[in-house]
Structure formats: C-alpha cells, structure tokens
C-alpha cells in the first residue's frame, strides 16, 4: 500500500472511530484539543494545566482515587467551590457520612447553598444523584465515595454473608443510566474512590479500585491522588505535598502530573503552585534559595516566597496572568467577572419548567493548548 493510500486509510479509520465512539475516543498526542469543550476550573492552576483543557469538562464523569488521607475530598471540594463562584448549583452525596462543613467552608464552599445527601444504601444514593442530574438544575455532583455505596442486600443481610459482584453490578447499571443524562444536562459528575489490593498478584501493580470496571470505562478523566512528602514548619507538620496524576483523559493527552501543596485547614495552596509554575517558566527567577521577580527579591526559601505572594495580591495577580498565558489556561470570562448576576440568571433558566433542553451554563472555554 502506497504512503498516500495508507494516510487516506488511516484518516478514514479515525473518522469511523469518532463516528462510532464519539469525539475524543482517539487522537494524536501532539494535536490540539477540541476548543469547543466547556470547562470549569478545578481550583488548582497546576491541575488545570495537567488536564489540558483548563479544568473539568462539563457533561463528563470524573473519578478521583487514591490512598487514605491523600487529598481526594479536598480536590473535589475545590471543584464545588469553583462551580458555586460562577453561580452554579452543587450537590454532595456523602455516602461515607464524613462531610466536614467547617473544612468545606474554609475551602470556599457555600455551605448554605450546597445540596447534601447522606444516603442509607448505595441504591438510594445513586437514585438521588440521578434525580438531581435529570432535573437539569445541578452543575456538579460529587459522590463520596464509591466504596461506601453499599448495596441494600448487603445492608439488610448478616455479617459474613457473601455478596460477590453485587456492588460492581450496581455501579454498572447506574452508570449506564447516568452517563447519557450527565452529557445532556452538562453536569460534572465526580466520583471519589478508594483503593484495594488484589490478592495473589506477584507481578505488576496489585492496586485496584472497588466498584468494578464500569467506572473506569465511563470516566472521561481519572485522577490518581497520592501524598509525596510532608510540609513542615520547624518540627510541626502543616500540610502535604501531593501529586495528582491524570491517568486517563479523553479530552486531552493524559499522563500529566500536577504537584500541589495541601495545607491543613486551608486546602490547596494557590500561592505555592503559582510560585512553582512561575519558576518553571522563568517568570520568577530562582537562584539558590532566593526567589526574585523583576529583579526584586521576594523571599528566601519557598515558604517565605509563598508568604510574600499572599501578602502582595497585586504581584500575585500579575504573575498569575503571565503563568496562565504561558500554559494556555484561560482566566474566567469577562461576563462572569463583571456581571455574576447575569450568569446566575442564565443558569437559573436550566431549572425552568417546560424547557426541552437545559441551557448550557455560561463558563470559560479552553482555547488552544
């Protein structure tokens, strides 16, 4: 087969795949992403860059998984806060019954407007999520966590009873039903998940996530969250350095890693990630332990430089503008920044009765990466 014929055959195959399986099912790693994907920022500039489209795509399923106390819930709550800042409505399905309102509020979540459910069974939790998403009035739903969505038969049974594959079947059935509704209503669905170890695995990674394979298949984005090291102030531990790896991404090339500081009681340190990204792009100069900007020293050591940025918002904003430009991340739209009430009115139309198709909420869209 000639070179031109091979190229034509490949293009025909790619078009057929996209027609059969949807946009983003296959792509060249170096090509530009779809600029029409509507997104909401994750609350972390580094994660927005790693995701490749400037945030979480609307109408898609996202899975966040990792070991215990790695920062999974923190990452999800930052997404909730960002949606609420843009006039959106958020729902939180707390299957673990471990929601901390004070911590969520510290991260920027409007607790008074957050819709919270603490279901008794997995079926109840997923049915509540389905009803909320189907209403067209919800912009983001967080399920915390998949492992805690216990099937009714297991709840009502005796300790020690065998329920092989019951939760996997529940998740498979629920996701088949939810995926289409999520896409139509442009809702972001975030499923937090734990990790387990497969017994008898001698080679390869023994870790897996509970709930079967369905969530892995239906997720547009899968994020693996792991602690890298502790952050100390003198001898006191004040936070954790966390790595967020994009292990699956159907809207941009995957396998990128974002490193963030999660500070106890504060969430993701935006000044810390801004400093790291600016230093990587030579926007902020780093010589030894000193950080400087436009020839002026802003701190000796990373923590002092972070503190300087927190105390000088004008400098921080100027650096952030340059970092966004360097990484190709859009700032929020002028409409959202200047007229938030208008955005709220547009979002309210989604919930208006008689609408055949909910209006897509106004949100920043990603330009060329």
From Swiss-Prot:
Pfam annotation, one family: RecA
Region (Disordered), start-end ranges: 328-369
Protein name (database record): Protein RecA
MF-aspect GO terms: ATP binding; ATP hydrolysis activity; ATP-dependent DNA damage sensor activity; damaged DNA binding; single-stranded DNA binding
Binding site for ATP: 66-73
Superkingdom classification of source: Bacteria
Residue ranges with Basic and acidic residues bias: 339-369
Keyword RNA-binding among UniProt keywords: no
Function: Can catalyze the hydrolysis of ATP in the presence of single-stranded DNA, the ATP-dependent uptake of single-stranded DNA by duplex DNA, and the ATP-dependent hybridization of homologous single-stranded DNAs. It interacts with LexA causing its activation and leading to its autocatalytic cleavage.
UniProt keyword terms in alphabetical order: ATP-binding, Cytoplasm, DNA damage, DNA recombination, DNA repair, DNA-binding, Nucleotide-binding, SOS response
Family label: Belongs to the RecA family.
GO terms under biological process: DNA recombination; DNA repair; SOS response
Localisation: Cytoplasm
HAMAP family, per database record: RecA (MF_00268)
Originating organism: Lactobacillus delbrueckii subsp. bulgaricus (strain ATCC BAA-365 / Lb-18)
Record's GO cellular component terms: cytosol
């Amino acid at each position: 087969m000639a070179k031109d014929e091979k190229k034509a055959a490949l293009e025909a195959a790619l078009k057929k795949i996209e027609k059969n399986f949807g946009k983003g099912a296959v792509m060249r790693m170096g090509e530009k992403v779809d600029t029409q994907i509507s997104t909401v920022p994750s609350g972390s500039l580094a994660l927005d860059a790693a995701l490749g489209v400037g945030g979480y795509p609307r109408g898609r399923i996202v899975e966040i998984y990792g070991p215990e106390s790695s920062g999974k819930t923190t990452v999800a709550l930052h997404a909730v806060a960002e949606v609420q800042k843009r006039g959106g409505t958020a729902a939180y399905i707390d299957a673990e019954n471990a929601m901390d309102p004070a911590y969520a509020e510290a991260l920027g979540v409007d607790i008074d407007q957050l819709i919270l459910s603490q279901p008794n069974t997995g079926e109840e939790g997923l049915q509540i999520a389905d009803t909320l998403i189907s209403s067209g009035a919800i912009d983001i739903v967080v399920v915390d966590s998949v492992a805690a969505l216990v099937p009714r038969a297991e709840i009502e049974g005796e300790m020690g009873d065998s329920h092989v594959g019951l939760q996997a079947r529940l998740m498979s059935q629920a996701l088949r039903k939810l995926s289409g509704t999520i896409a139509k209503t442009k809702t972001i669905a975030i499923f937090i998940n734990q990790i387990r170890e497969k017994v008898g695995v001698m080679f390869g990674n023994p870790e897996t996530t509970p709930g079967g394979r369905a969530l892995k298949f239906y997720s547009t984005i899968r994020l693996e969250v792991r602690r890298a090291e502790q952050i100390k102030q003198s001898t006191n531990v004040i936070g954790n350095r966390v790595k967020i790896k994009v292990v699956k991404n159907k809207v941009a090339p995957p396998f990128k890693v974002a490193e963030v500081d999660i500070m106890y009681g504060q969430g993701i340190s935006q000044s810390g990630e801004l400093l790291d990204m600016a230093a990587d792009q030579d926007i902020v100069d780093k010589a030894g332990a000193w950080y400087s900007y436009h020839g002026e020293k802003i701190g000796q050591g990373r923590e002092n430089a972070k503190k300087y940025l927190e105390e000088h918002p004008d400098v921080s904003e100027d650096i952030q503008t340059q970092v966004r430009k360097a990484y190709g991340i859009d700032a929020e739209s002028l409409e959202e920044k200047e007229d938030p009430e208008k955005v709220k009115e547009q979002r309210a139309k989604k919930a208006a009765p008689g609408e055949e198709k909910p209006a897509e909420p106004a949100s920043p869209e990603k330009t060329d990466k």
